[in-house]
Regions:
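A cross-family phosphate/adenosyl-ligand binding-site feature
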Residues: 1-141, 146, 160-166, 171-173, ...
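Cys/His-rich Zn2+-binding cysteine-cluster or related metal-binding knuckle/ribbon modules and their
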Residues: 149
Length: 232
């Protein structure tokens, strides 16, 4: 099958989405669509290289907001029905809101719009799917209560991208999630994979419900449940 997999800038269900994408890439031709935010977030969580690894060659491609500019020419293939399937996982509340209001000004939202025109089946995993609280994983974080404000911050010196502002914070736009800082800090002042609880906003839940009613779009609660629905 010819499949498009689009990532948006959500950290929740991101690792699970990458794992599901890798599974599909084993036996299918895959094009990856990256929003600008997803590029940043994939790097923060140390997952960007895994996404890039499944692309390359004649049939597996990587398209991003940065290399598709403002006209997103690659999405024209979707309007022509040249894909069997478009998957958007994870899908942020911002992306859902744009889609349900007919806005297609990013690579991913434009891909969904063009898929609708080309009658390409579209499967999505919104991160705001039902009311209540949800646990999610944070990228690397400097724990100030543990930081000893060493004269020479070993974590900052070891960071290959200069992402650590000593004693203050981690610049997540520079962070690639390699974990070097956590491994080297003698006071365990850097955390990775910390779990927090987030509350789902009512407006985001309402937009997801609207998304579910849109023609040609199916929604799932996890990437695994999406995979399980496919007869591949």
């Amino acid at each position: 099958m010819k499949i498009g997999w689009a990532f948006t800038g959500a950290g929740h269900l991101l690792k699970e989405s990458v794992e599901a994408m890798e599974e599909l890439a084993k036996d299918n031709d895959l094009t990856v669509f990256l929003s600008q935010a997803s590029e940043e977030v994939l790097k923060m969580y140390g997952l960007y290289d895994r996404v890039v690894a499944v692309t390359g060659g004649r049939y597996n491609e990587l398209a991003s907001d940065s290399n598709q500019k403002f006209s997103f020419p690659i999405t024209g293939r979707l309007s022509l029905g040249k894909y069997d399937l478009l998957i958007v996982s994870p899908t942020t509340a911002n992306t859902v809101a744009k889609i349900v209001h007919g806005i297609s000004d990013t690579l991913v939202t434009n891909a969904v719009a063009q898929a609708g025109k080309g009658r390409v089946r579209t499967l999505m995993v919104p991160v705001d799917i039902e009311p209540g609280d949800v646990e999610t994983i944070l990228p690397s974080k400097l724990e100030k209560t543990k930081c000893q404000k060493c004269d020479e911050c070993e974590a900052a010196l070891a960071c290959p991208n200069g992402a650590i502002i000593a004693h203050e914070e981690i610049d997540l736009l520079k962070c690639i999630g390699c974990g070097t800082c956590k491994d080297i800090c003698p006071y365990d002042a850097v955390s990775t994979g910390k779990i927090i609880t987030m509350h789902m906003r009512e407006i985001d839940i309402e937009n997801t419900q609207k998304l579910q009613k849109m023609e040609g779009i199916e929604i799932f609660d996890t990437p695994q449940s999406l995979l399980d629905s496919l007869d591949l």
